[in-house]
């Protein structure tokens, strides 16, 4: 409440001046080690992770580029006194998590231009800094990041680092400009909610019970194997490719087969293709047997329950459970799941819910 009141005053008072730091990290990535291949959580917590440098802007001062060893980066961040500033980033889940998990720094307040943009654009523009800068500002995002593929900091020439720094400085200036445009349509109470959602990810508290997860994964895989064995002995796994026979399998599992109107014949037909939304939705059916047969039909090796459990196990090896909810992630305005996980729809009473633990002194 005190934090919310402070933000209310800061946003509505001409007399109270907040001090802002706008920040952007540039990090090592390769074809295999990148956010396109991994979750944000796994990427940042991985031993391969490296900060190439970062740019920062204190209030209206020009953006500055900092590069160096991990120790030098840490020292520069420490000198900025970020815990006593309001931090502005684009895609705060990324930059905020780097600050928190790699350098132990939590700002006074998170202000994320990506979250701020969603209710304004209605999810039609895209959330990239490039797309938003082109819509709301006269600035343009560079493409020097493409030249950084597969390069550690030690692989950059001094000239390359200068160019990368100019690119990063430009990103920070664009983010600062974007923030002032977007904040007009983001009331303090919404900024407060955005901050809370970011903190759920950057400053996680919940832990995962590995014993529960391991037992559950073994149980799910065992049930799937036995189910597929029964199918092999009865109709044969190849029969899953037969629409009528697969429809009977679904009916025996208590699921009414989805239907569609065939474009070719204009007659009703089973909707069992990879492009049929209602059919693909069965991959998330609460009955893991339904998940298994649908996954087998689609040629998917792992069911959703297996994938979720394996994901939880991976997180449990790396630390606490960060929960990323995308503010205004759906067109209705509700939050959506982020970082390839949605803890809003875990099955009630399931093992995944039971695996989430609250540490001592947090209840």
Where are these regions (language model features)?
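Short alpha-helical segments and helix-capping/turn motifs at coil-helix boundaries
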Residues: 11, 38-39, 70-77, 310, ...
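Compositionally biased regions
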Residues: 6, 14, 64-65, 70, ...
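Generic signature of intrinsically disordered, low-complexity, basic-rich segments
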Residues: 6-11, 18, 144, 265
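Conserved "right-hand" nucleotidyltransferase catalytic core of DNA-directed polymerases
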Residues: 15-33, 46-48, 53-55, 124, ...
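Intrinsic-disorder/low-complexity peptide segments enriched for small residues
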Residues: 1-5, 14, 36, 97
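Structural motif
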Residues: 86, 362-363
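Conserved DEDDh/DEDDy metal-dependent 3′-5′ exonuclease domain
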Residues: 20-22, 30-37, 44-181
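Catalytic phosphate/metal-binding cores of nucleic-acid and nucleotide-processing enzymes, i.e., regions
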Residues: 2-11, 109, 188-190
